[in-house]
């Protein structure tokens, strides 16, 4: 974002991550056929979503809740798929090779790198 653009998004107090999550969720809704709250003017869904957010045309708490629910669903599917893959690999392959890092979580590999996103805070709806 350019220096002069900060006034447009003043309601986010510098939390660009939350803005991206909201715009992404709203663009996803628009792609799924939701009606726009502003004139489209030939803009793409991402631009329309940002214009709706800037124009305060949406219930942002509801949009954020939908984004959190969508993320939870994705994580559940990902976790289930990972468990199935782990079960299959444990049946077909030897237990583990020396130095193998497959199966280690992101936090186990580098705990400091994962500190930028507190998962519990995100899922509780607390963006700040």
Swiss-Prot record:
SUPFAM superfamilies linked to this entry: RPB6/omega subunit-like (SSF63562)
Q: Which UniProt keywords apply?
A: DNA-directed RNA polymerase, Nucleotidyltransferase, Transcription, Transferase
The UniProt entry's GO biological process terms, in alphabetical order, are:
DNA-templated transcription
Instruction: Identify the stretch(es) annotated as Disordered.
Output: 87-106
Instruction: Write down the Pfam families for this protein, in alphabetical order.
Output: RNA_pol_Rpb6
Record carries keyword Phosphoprotein: no
One Gene Ontology molecular-function label: DNA binding
**Per the UniProt record, which EC number(s) apply here?**
2.7.7.6
Catalytic reactions on record: RNA(n) + a ribonucleoside 5'-triphosphate = RNA(n+1) + diphosphate
Question: Is Nuclease set as a keyword in this record?
Answer: no
Assembly notes: The RNAP catalytic core consists of 2 alpha, 1 beta, 1 beta' and 1 omega subunit. When a sigma factor is associated with the core the holoenzyme is formed, which can initiate transcription.
Q: Which family does it belong to?
A: Belongs to the RNA polymerase subunit omega family.
Describe the function of this protein.
Promotes RNA polymerase assembly. Latches the N- and C-terminal regions of the beta' subunit thereby facilitating its interaction with the beta and alpha subunits.
The protein, known as: DNA-directed RNA polymerase subunit omega
Q: What does UniProt list as this organism's lineage?
A: Bacteria, Pseudomonadati, Pseudomonadota, Alphaproteobacteria, Rickettsiales
């Amino acid at each position: 974002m350019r220096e002069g653009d900060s006034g447009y998004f003043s309601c986010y107090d510098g939390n660009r991550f939350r803005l991206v999550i909201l715009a992404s969720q709203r663009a996803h809704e628009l792609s799924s056929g939701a009606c726009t709250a502003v004139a489209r003017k030939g803009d793409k869904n991402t631009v329309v979503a940002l214009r709706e957010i800037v124009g305060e045309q949406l219930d942002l708490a509801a949009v954020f809740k939908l984004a959190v629910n969508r993320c939870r669903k994705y994580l559940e599917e990902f976790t289930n798929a990972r468990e199935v893959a782990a079960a299959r690999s444990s049946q077909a392959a030897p237990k583990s090779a020396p130095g193998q890092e497959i199966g280690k979580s992101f936090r186990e590999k580098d705990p400091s790198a994962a500190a930028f996103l507190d998962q519990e805070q995100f899922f509780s709806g607390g963006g700040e």
